């Protein structure tokens, strides 16, 4: 049986986690305009956010499969949002790179545990639950 209330709650968490991931492409032009960075420099931020977080995500997937750590979802949302929010306080490249990396790792922490929870909450309606979860993430990315 679909536990609709909690599926929507996890989808809201997905929304807030993915706001940070959607914000990064939107702020790249500001780094170029105000900090004098070039396109290859800001491409490094996308590398930090996407590629580096993808490298560690399987580790958190393994952890989600072997231990139930639902608090990892909260940690992931917190890291993702706070680190991306702190980006605006720094002007030097490597500080921003580090914060973007931490934000991406927050996203990598959130997604496997959240996917595990969605599967558990879905009952026989896995497609419906996953769709609701996905709408949350896509909405967050769009708002970001």
What are these regions (language model features)?
Residues 99-136:
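Cytoplasmic helix-loop-helix junction between adjacent transmembrane helices
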Residues 22, 50-58, 141-142:
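Residue-level signature of mid-helix packing/kink "hotspots" within the transmembrane helices
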Residues 16-24:
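Conserved extracellular-gate-facing transmembrane-helix segments in secondary transporters
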Residues 24-36:
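Membrane-interface helix caps of multi-pass secondary transporters
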Residues 83, 94-102:
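Paired small-residue
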Residues 14, 46, 50, 77, ...:
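Small-residue-rich transmembrane alpha-helices and their cytosolic helix-loop interfaces
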Residues 55-91:
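Conserved MFS/SLC helix-loop-helix module at the cytosolic interface between two early adjacent transmembrane helices
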Residues 36, 68, 89-94, 123:
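Helix-breaking motifs and short loop linkers at transmembrane-helix boundaries and internal kinks
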């Amino acid at each position: 049986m679909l536990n609709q209330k909690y599926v929507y709650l996890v989808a809201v968490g997905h929304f807030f986690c993915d706001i940070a991931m959607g914000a990064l492409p939107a702020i790249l032009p500001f780094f170029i305009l105000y900090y004098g960075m070039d396109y290859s420099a800001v491409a490094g931020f996308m590398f930090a956010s996407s590629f580096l977080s993808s490298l560690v995500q399987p580790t958190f997937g393994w952890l989600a499969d072997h231990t139930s750590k639902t608090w990892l979802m909260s940690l992931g949302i917190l890291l993702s949002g706070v680190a991306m929010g702190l980006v605006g306080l720094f002007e030097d490249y490597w500080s921003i790179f580090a914060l973007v990396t931490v934000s991406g790792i927050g996203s990598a922490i959130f997604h496997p545990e959240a996917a595990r929870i969605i599967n558990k909450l879905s009952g026989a309606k896995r497609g419906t639950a996953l769709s609701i979860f996905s709408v949350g993430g896509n909405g967050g990315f769009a708002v970001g």
